[in-house]
Regions:
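Short, compositionally biased segments
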Residues: 85-86
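Small-residue helix/turn framework positions
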Residues: 3-46, 51-72, 77-79, 89-314
């Protein structure tokens, strides 16, 4: 066994290489107080893990303060085994890939496996427990989009590349979102990217309908919930529900994560009353979808149609185009 103590601007801590012991393979054991990986160093880290798999059989890594590409991402814990998986393909089996922040905790596992001679793909099963959506987005580079908001985002997602480099064009998966007690804040067009579409202030700004008393300061919500499917960088939903104290919206459609465009159907409920409250009693089954759900509601509760307005939202995230559907 050898041990190395490290103290530098980029990292501080210790590393050990532990030899095999019975059924326990050799292990790289790392404990760091901090680790800073600037953008220029990310390819080097990925190259090390890709080109030297047999010499690093297992990883046990804890970093108390991780900074990746200039973003402070809190505590990182990795437990990974390099092995030959199914179909005789060598992979990093990620038994633990956890990130802990004051605003949220990511708990994940999965693998990073070769798809071909030069391509490796990350696959993660994850739960993101969110304590403050607004502060989390601020940390990740989107300030002033949301205030508060607690809940969960969980599912499965995969992409070409390493666990530390998201590649939207190859991303696929599915996830469920459930956030409560927050507020989409009033922002300039494009400042919050796709979140700007969910902030219903975009509707009165672009249309003659006067919803300004409801949405002028941003949309305060009791909950935002729904399912999202991602296929090669395009996200789809057919059951997204947003409910506020006096108003709400139902959304289905798609958003291109690479081109930053969308094509959405938005049904606005400017007043939640005895007629429209039924729209939010139950979660919309993704097998049914918003269109069928609304059709059933209109048949059973005719007041629902009278209490809603429908819009098409397309164009770019920075400049969405909103059209009322008569």
């Amino acid at each position: 066994m050898w041990r190395l103590n490290i103290s530098a601007d980029e990292l501080n801590g210790s590393a050990e290489v532990r030899p095999p012991n019975g059924n326990v393979p050799a292990q790289l054991y790392v404990r760091l107080a901090y680790l800073n990986i600037p953008p220029s160093s990310v390819p080097d880290v990925e190259r090390l893990l890709t080109e030297q798999p047999s010499s690093i059989p297992t990883l046990d890594i804890v970093v108390n303060e991780l900074t990746l590409r200039g973003k402070k991402l809190g505590r990182l814990e990795i437990d990974a085994v390099n092995r030959v998986g199914t179909n005789a393909v060598r992979e990093w089996r990620l038994n633990k890939f956890n990130v802990t922040l004051p605003e949220a905790t990511l708990t994940a596992n999965g693998n990073w496996a070769a798809e071909g001679p030069r391509v490796r793909r990350t696959q993660l099963n994850f739960v993101l427990a969110i304590r403050d959506s607004g502060d989390l987005l601020t940390r990740l580079g989107t300030p002033g989009a949301i205030r508060y908001g607690e809940g969960r985002l969980e599912g499965q997602v995969s992409w070409q590349g390493s666990p530390i480099t998201l590649h939207y064009a190859s991303m696929s998966g599915k996830m469920n979102l459930a956030i409560e007690k927050g507020q989409f804040l009033k922002t300039e067009p494009g400042a919050a990217r796709l979140l700007g579409v969910l902030n219903l202030q975009a509707l009165p700004r672009r249309l003659t309908l006067d919803f300004s008393d409801l949405f002028s300061d941003g949309f305060a919500f009791d909950f935002v919930r729904g399912d999202v499917r991602i296929d090669q960088g395009v996200a789809f939903t057919n059951n997204l529900q947003m409910k506020g104290v006096v108003a709400g919206a139902l959304i289905e459609g798609s958003a291109d994560l690479v081109r930053e465009t969308q094509k959405l159907k938005v049904v606005v409920v400017p007043e939640i009353n005895a007629g429209t409250a039924a729209l939010y009693v139950a979660t919309i089954n993704p097998l049914i979808g918003l269109t069928s759900y609304l059709a059933q509601m209109v048949l059973s509760k005719p007041l629902v149609r009278a209490g809603t307005s429908e819009f098409q939202v397309d164009g770019t995230w920075a400049d969405p185009r909103v059209t009322k559907v008569d």
